[in-house]
């Protein structure tokens, strides 16, 4: 088991934030028609993976990746709702609840 420190948790948080930013820029780039926003998206993804690489030095890969992906998806759904007026249907909400439950189970394992 690796030594978990606040440092690793902070890098995981940064990776999550950068993933959300990347997704927002990707949506705003309109399929890379706005090249500079597409490039900002790519840079954000690179930053997210770099931060995740630092996080997994102290957090098990399976836990870090599940939390990164899960929180990234949940927050991207919220950002889509707030910024772009996108709404989930009933199946989408069920999927989000299952995703969050899975993250809790993985963290407790």
From Swiss-Prot:
The keyword Ribosomal protein does not apply. The chain crosses the membrane at residues 6-26, 35-55, 64-84, 88-108. It comes from the Bacteria. InterPro entries: Small_drug/metabolite_transptr (IPR000390), Small_multidrug_res (IPR045324), Spermidine_export_MdtI (IPR023737). The keyword Chloroplast does not apply. Keywords: Cell inner membrane, Cell membrane, Membrane, Transmembrane, Transmembrane helix, Transport. One of its GO terms (biological process) is glycine betaine transport. GO terms for cellular component: plasma membrane. SUPFAM superfamilies: Multidrug resistance efflux transporter EmrE. Gene3D superfamilies: 1.10.3730.20. GO terms for molecular function: amino-acid betaine transmembrane transporter activity; antiporter activity; choline transmembrane transporter activity; spermidine transmembrane transporter activity. Pfam families: Multi_Drug_Res (PF00893). It is found in: Cell inner membrane. Forms a complex with MdtJ. Belongs to the drug/metabolite transporter (DMT) superfamily. Small multidrug resistance (SMR) (TC 2.A.7.1) family. MdtI subfamily. Catalyzes the excretion of spermidine. This is Spermidine export protein MdtI. The gene is mdtI.
């Amino acid at each position: 088991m690796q030594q978990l420190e606040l440092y690793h948790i902070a890098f995981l948080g940064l990776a999550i934030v950068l993933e959300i930013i990347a997704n927002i820029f990707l949506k705003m780039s309109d399929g890379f028609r706005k090249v500079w926003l597409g490039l900002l998206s790519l840079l954000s993804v690179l930053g997210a993976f770099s931060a995740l690489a630092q996080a997994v030095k102290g957090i098990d890969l399976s836990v870090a990746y599940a939390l990164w992906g899960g929180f990234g998806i949940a927050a991207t759904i919220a950002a889509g709702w707030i910024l772009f007026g996108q709404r989930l249907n009933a199946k989408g909400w069920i999927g989000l609840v299952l995703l969050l439950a899975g993250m809790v189970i993985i963290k407790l394992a």
